[in-house]
Design a protein with these regions (language model features):
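Catalytic cores of TIM-barrel enzymes
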Residues: 1-420
Length: 420
């Protein structure tokens, strides 16, 4: 792919990097070991910004990301604004699902914190399955954003028809609903500002020869249930107390989840979808529970995305070594499995010829180790996991916030020595 109308050295590098990634993803040997840059707050720290500044200063974060990409020279990057730059919008919404730096006493130096809570009670399962959009509008959004509580008063439109639609307009004149709608407009304007900076940065990095490696996000159905609806306690109890309801919800989610990712990728003119997983790790579910409540539904999501021409990059957080023989059941050369603590050598043995493997330089090594430690670990990964291709070098869950710059530089620089 050329950048602009003329062939430039940067456009040649862009095409080479893009091809290097695709060769690895599609299980061919690239010219050398490819890398992707993914982080939350490390790129901000690398430029002297704290976490609060990263979440509120769109232009400053763009400059930090630009510096990190230029210095590290990865073959692809995941845009950082889409991960952290939500501070002003969350302020407007009075958002409830996170605490973030400078908000309610959290230090400016601390990353945002996820708040585990129940946002859908057990007797609402059927309501969500029957009318997910209505549930999200009337119940979920008012629960996760204080400024949107009045949306619970909106008309129940499936039962409001013909002239009653006209009569229902009265609801929008209520002061509290007007305030909620004005808040949505204000929040939308703020997100437009952030997206504009992000889009400009992606284009600038493209001109410099660096492709984006994430064009949308998606989820596993069980993670949606546990992270965003029932909460961890509710989801764990439902594995035993509400099995049929939980399975019904996840079957519904297999059709609800993919369209958002497909739409995002189309808007970004890209084909890589990032999927962080939280509940598929060893030790949480038994093998039988995993093959009942997690994998079949998630596999359907993956296959739908693949059929749409997309390449899922699945971040398997924690240790998932015991799942390898199950999760290898996907079309060859269409998925990337990004491992944190899974045994990479067993993963290569199980997934060779089927899935591209990404990872997994440990966070602890990047934070407390030395560049020589990093280089030695990367060499082991390249020699074994990189054998025959199908491997992308990265940190275990992306570059950790506290990683030493010299260790991060060592990882990315060493990859350029790994020639096939």
């Amino acid at each position: 792919m050329s950048v602009g109308s003329a062939v430039t050295p940067e456009s040649v590098l862009y095409a080479q990097r893009q091809q290097r990634l695709m060769d690895a993803i599609e299980l061919r040997e690239p010219d050398r070991l490819p890398t992707i840059l993914f982080s939350h707050f490390w790129v901000a720290h690398y430029s002297g910004m704290n976490c609060r500044q990263a979440m509120y200063d769109y232009e400053g974060l763009a400059a930090a990301m630009r510096k990190a990409v230029v210095d590290l020279e990865p073959d692809g990057f995941q845009p950082v604004h889409a991960v952290v730059a939500f501070g002003p919008t969350m302020d407007i919404l009075d958002y409830k699902q996170l605490e973030w730096p400078g908000h309610k006493g959290l230090s400016d130096e601390m990353p945002f914190q996820y708040l585990d809570a129940e946002y859908m009670v057990p007797n609402e399962y059927e309501e969500y399955v029957l009318d997910p959009t209505g549930f999200m509008l009337h119940k979920y959004m008012p629960r996760v954003a204080g400024a949107l509580e009045p949306l619970s008063q909106l008309p129940m439109y499936p039962g409001v028809l013909h002239t009653r639609i006209i009569q229902s307009m009265e609801a929008y004149a209520r002061p509290e609903i007007r305030r909620a709608l004005e808040t949505l407009i204000k929040a939308g304007g703020e997100m437009q500002k952030m997206r504009a900076v992000q889009s400009r940065l992606i284009e600038e990095l493209k001109v410099l020869g660096f492709p984006s490696a994430a064009h949308g996000t998606s989820h596993a159905p069980f993670d949606v249930a546990a992270d965003y609806l029932r909460g961890s306690k509710g989801a764990m109890l439902d594995l035993f107390r509400n099995k049929d309801r939980l399975l019904s919800l996840m079957d519904r989610l297999t059709t609800l989840i993919p369209p958002a990712a497909i739409s995002a990728a189309k808007a970004a003119s890209g084909n890589m979808i990032f999927i962080p997983l939280h509940w598929g790790l060893d030790g949480f579910m038994s093998p039988k529970q995993f093959t009942t409540f997690f994998w079949p539904q998630f596999q359907k999501v993956l296959l739908t995305l693949i059929e749409a021409g997309l390449y899922p990059h699945v971040l398997w957080e924690g240790n998932c070594t015991s799942r390898l023989d199950v999760i290898k059941d996907v079309p060859p050369g269409k998925c990337v499995y990004f491992f944190e603590r899974t045994d990479m050598f067993k993963a290569k043995e199980a997934l060779r010829g089927t899935v591209c493997i990404r990872g997994n330089v440990p966070a602890s090594m990047l934070i407390t180790g030395a560049p020589s430690d990093v280089r030695e670990y990367c060499k082991k990964l390249f020699d074994v996991v990189g054998d025959g291709g199908g491997f992308i070098l990265d940190a275990g869950v992306g570059v950790p916030d506290e990683a030493k710059p010299e260790n991060v530089l060592a990882m990315y620089r060493y990859s350029k020595e790994c020639v096939y």
